[in-house]
């Protein structure tokens, strides 16, 4: 009962965060904000209303980019604190209940869906193939065919690739869960060819030329390829949107798309449902034309 929120946060950063390398910097920064705001509050006095008050303060914060903090970012601050509180309940028995359990997440606007048209895709793939960077074409093909996140594909290791079964297992994922995606056809052929010239001193599929212990940074060749291909308003993450969009337009069920992308819930793939509906509309139209086209 004597522990304060500051005690909890400091212990969490010291003992737990080192095991969460991918979120260490982000979580530490977010938790320190909470410590600055209400770190001296005893855990026994930590209330839902107090946290809500600070959440609303956070939502009015102006960022370094001179913009009000987005609901999504506020929700990440809330998630960091809630995770730490849950750890104190389960593992340390410092608290009996999480006061954040009753607090709703801020409503986030639906994210944009930017995907490549057929013409854009062909231009971009041609530009990547002609790039001075000999690996750019392969990594873009892999991104489009697997829907993997940028770091998942950039940090891919040979130990996570089964060329015989045609399977990639992403182990360094955003939600710390393993995910396997089949690799077939052209992408598998390209990766097989690439495996024949892999470096002996690195398990990384796309290692840096200067330091094989780290992954290659594709930002510059990627930007140049976009310019050459005349593809505008397109980010690397949109390759992931493109993969999901193509799956939806080919009639793949939302649950399957979620599994391929590594989403725990269907809510993150609902943005693609209209594409699936458009595809189904075309299918029904074609079927009706074939069945009834000659009838007056």
Sequence positions of predicted segments:
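N-terminal DNA-binding module of tyrosine recombinases/phage integrases
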Residues: 1-53, 57
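Short basic/aromatic active-site micro-motif
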Residues: 46, 135-136, 232-250
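Basic, Lys/Arg- and aromatic-enriched nucleic-acid-binding interface segment
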Residues: 68-71, 75-79, 90, 94-150, ...
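C-terminal catalytic core of tyrosine-transesterase DNA break-rejoin enzymes
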Residues: 90, 141, 145-152, 221-224, ...
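Catalytic-site neighborhood detector that most strongly recognizes the C-terminal catalytic loop/helix
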Residues: 115, 172-176, 186-188, 261-286
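Short, polar N-cap/turn motifs at the start of nucleic acid-interacting alpha helices
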Residues: 160-167, 233, 252-271, 282
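Active-site/catalytic core of tyrosine-dependent DNA strand-transfer enzymes
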Residues: 184-232
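C-terminal secondary-structure termini that scaffold catalytic or DNA-interacting sites
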Residues: 193-197, 207-212, 267, 285-296
């Amino acid at each position: 009962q004597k522990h304060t929120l500051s005690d909890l946060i400091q212990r969490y950063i010291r003992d737990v965060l080192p095991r969460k390398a991918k979120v260490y910097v982000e979580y530490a920064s977010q938790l320190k904000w909470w410590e600055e705001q209400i770190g001296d509050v005893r855990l026994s006095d930590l209330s839902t209303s107090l946290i809500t008050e600070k959440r609303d303060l956070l939502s009015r914060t102006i960022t370094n980019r001179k913009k009000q903090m987005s609901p999504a970012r506020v929700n990440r601050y809330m998630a960091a604190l809630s995770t730490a509180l849950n750890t104190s309940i389960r593992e340390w028995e410092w608290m009996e209940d999480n006061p954040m359990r009753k607090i709703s997440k801020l409503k986030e606007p639906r994210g944009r869906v930017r995907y490549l048209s057929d013409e854009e895709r062909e231009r971009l793939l041609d530009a990547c193939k002609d790039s001075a960077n000999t690996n750019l074409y392969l990594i873009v093909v892999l991104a489009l065919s697997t829907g993997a996140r940028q770091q998942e594909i950039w940090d891919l290791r040979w130990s996570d690739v089964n060329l015989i079964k045609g399977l990639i297992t992403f182990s360094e994922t955003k939600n710390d869960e393993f995910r396997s995606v089949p690799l077939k056809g052209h992408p598998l052929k390209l990766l097989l060819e690439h495996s024949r010239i892999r470096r002996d001193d690195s398990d990384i599929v796309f290692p840096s030329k200067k330091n094989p212990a780290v992954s290659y940074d594709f930002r510059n060749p990627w930007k140049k390829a976009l310019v050459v291909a005349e593809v505008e308003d397109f980010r690397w993450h949109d390759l992931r949107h493109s993969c999901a969009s193509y799956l939806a337009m080919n009639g793949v069920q939302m649950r399957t798309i979620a599994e391929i992308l590594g989403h725990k819930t269907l809510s993150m793939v609902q943005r693609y449902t209209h594409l699936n509906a458009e595809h189904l509309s075309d299918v029904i139209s074609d079927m009706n034309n074939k069945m009834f086209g000659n009838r007056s």
